[in-house]
Each structure stands twice: as C-alpha cells, then as structure tokens.
C-alpha cells in the first residue's frame, strides 16, 4: 500500500520529524528492559527467544542488575527511567519481590510483562508492596486460540483471572497485549468485547514478525489484506471509544499514521529504550538480533555504552538501501524497526509494503 500521504498528514509528519531529530540527538534514556530470566512455563508458538522451563542461561543475579541501576542513577534522574521486567516469564523468579524492592529503593518506577499464569492474589499483593507500578498481561485470543498460541491448556483461564484481578485492584497502570495472527484475526471483535467486559481500558495489538519459532509458522503471518483489516479494526475501535486500542510500534503505516496510535511512528530502540539481557548483553529492544548488541554489563559500564555507542540505532543512513532507498516515506520511517533487520542488515518485513 504505497499510496501518497495526505497533505495534512505530511505536514504533521514533517513537524514530528524535527522533534524526533532532537530526541535522537539527546537520546534520553526513558525505558530500560531487564530480561531477568529466560525460564518460562509456556511454550508459545511465536516466541522469539525459544525459552524453556529450565533455560541454559541462568537468571541474572539481582546484584548484577543493581550495578546497572547505579550506573544509570549516577547519570540521570531515576524517576524518569521506567524499568520493565521481562523474560522468559518474570514470575518464574522466586526473588522477584526482592528485585522489585531493590529497584524501588533506588527510586526507579518499575513494571513487568507477564503471561499471568503465576499471578496469584498473594503474589500480586507482595509485588505491590515491592513498589510495582505497571503491568502488561498477554491475551492472544479467546480460550481455544489463546491456549493454542501459548501451548498450555488452561492458560486462557489463568490469564483472564489475572487480568480481572489487576483491573479490579485499580492500583497500577495496566494494559493487555494481543499478538494478532491468522487464527485469532477473525475473532478480534469478540476479543475486544470480552476485554471490555472484564473492565479493561487499554489494549495493544501486535502482529507476529517472522523470527524465532514464528519464522517457520505460516499460521502466524497475516496477509496484506488482513493487515489492512487490522488497521481498520483498530481505527474503528478507537473511534467507538469503549476501549483505547493501539497498534504497537512495529513500523511506519502511511496514511494510518495518527489513526491507530496516539503518536506518529518512531523506533525508539537505542534512542530512549535500552535492554539488559539475561546474559548481560546491552541492547535496545530485547527482540533485536545479537548482531546489534552494543556491549555487556560484565565488561562495560552501562551508561558509558549508552552515551558512546548505539550509533547504528541513532544514525540509520546505513539502512538506506534495497527497497528503503526507493521508498517515498524514507524520511518518516527511517528504515523501519531494528527488530526487523537480519544479521546482514536486510529488512525482513515491511508492513506498509505488505499492505
């Protein structure tokens, strides 16, 4: 779908681009993801890390990540940096509450992404007492589709119970994420209504990009027509106003920009977003290939790496090749998301082109 941008949209994008240029120049760290474990109790069809219940890479010791936070605190205001705890499945760590207290005592707001399986009322209470500020739970369709995607019977019921519990508590910022695939795509309206029935206010939708297990599973990849249908669905849901639906930061969307997200597209990886992976690697988003890691906390100071490296993320002229070199939207897209680049720098997928 390579249609020309409307004049109004082009003007808005030009203004936004200038603001984005300033953000890139300043690269203020605003989100830090901590891959605290690679262990997981699910067997998701779309998993990019191919996690297992007993991972070969051990959990990162809390003290090691604490040193990273000390590096950040020495250079910036901790209140402005959100720590997002991910995995694997974070709830597999028995010391997660202790990790939360450590982050809280160092004055960082923190949240987590979970499948909800282990989120009992008792565990949730302890996490709140440890300073938990935000949470995201995954729900990939209604019962049959979710359990199929997650590879564990009963996972839908457990996720739903966790979602309802967090909503009813009303104590933290909360959203649900859904990975849209060919199987759950026809049922998105039913999923939306189910989530509204639970009382959910914010819902993020992703497509599944072809890496990890998903690279060899055609049931997970939407067609161009289905991607357009997804955009129209999000657009209509936002207009309806019963729930705030938003498409994820997966790439530039042409004339859907401004309609399916609250902001215009920008890949924040390496600009305001960084990650510390389970093996100590310093990266941007955890889903980006190891070829683009910028250092390792076991030999580098985190903030030194953040301030002196990450050039491939902040200067993307190296992406100006192949289809990107002839794309009329290059100056707004800047080569798409870093998670969509292979080990040779080639773009794996462009949603706009696919539409």
Where are the model-predicted features located?
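Flexible loop residues that form catalytic
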Residues: 52, 88, 140, 208, ...
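Residues immediately within or flanking Cys/His clusters that coordinate Zn2+
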Residues: 33, 37, 41, 264, ...
């Amino acid at each position: 779908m390579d249609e020309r941008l409307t004049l109004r949209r082009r003007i808005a994008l030009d203004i936004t681009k200038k603001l984005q240029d300033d953000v890139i120049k300043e690269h203020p760290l605003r989100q830090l993801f901590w891959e605290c474990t690679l262990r997981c109790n699910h067997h998701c069809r779309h998993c990019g890390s191919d996690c297992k219940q007993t991972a070969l890479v051990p959990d990162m010791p809390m003290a090691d990540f604490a040193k990273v936070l000390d590096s950040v605190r020495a250079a910036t205001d901790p209140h402005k940096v959100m720590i997002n705890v991910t995995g694997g499945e974070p709830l597999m760590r028995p010391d997660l509450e202790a990790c939360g207290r450590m982050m809280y005592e160092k004055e960082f707001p923190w949240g987590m992404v979970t499948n909800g399986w282990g989120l009992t009322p008792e565990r949730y209470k302890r996490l709140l007492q440890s300073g938990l500020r935000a949470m995201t739970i995954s729900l990939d369709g209604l019962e049959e589709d979710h359990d199929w995607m997650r590879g564990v019977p009963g996972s839908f019921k457990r996720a739903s119970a966790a979602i309802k519990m967090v909503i009813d508590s009303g104590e933290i910022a909360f959203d649900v994420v859904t990975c849209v695939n060919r199987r759950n795509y026809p049922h998105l309206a039913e999923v939306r209504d189910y989530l509204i029935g639970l009382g959910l206010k914010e819902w993020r939708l992703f497509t599944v990009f072809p890496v990890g297990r998903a690279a060899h599973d055609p049931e997970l990849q939407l067609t161009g027509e289905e991607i357009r249908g997804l955009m129209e669905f999000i657009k209509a849901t936002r207009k309806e106003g019963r729930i705030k639906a938003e498409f994820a930061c997966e790439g530039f969307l042409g004339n859907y920009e401004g309609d399916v997200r609250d902001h215009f597209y920008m890949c924040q990886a390496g600009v305001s977003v960084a990650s510390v992976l389970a093996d100590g690697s310093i990266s941007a988003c955890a889903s980006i290939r190891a070829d683009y890691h910028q250092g390792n906390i076991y030999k580098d100071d985190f903030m030194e790496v953040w301030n002196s490296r990450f050039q491939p993320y902040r200067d993307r002229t190296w992406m100006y090749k192949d289809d990107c070199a002839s794309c009329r939207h290059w100056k707004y897209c800047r080569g798409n998301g870093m998670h969509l680049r292979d080990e040779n720098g080639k773009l794996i997928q462009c949603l706009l082109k696919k539409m």
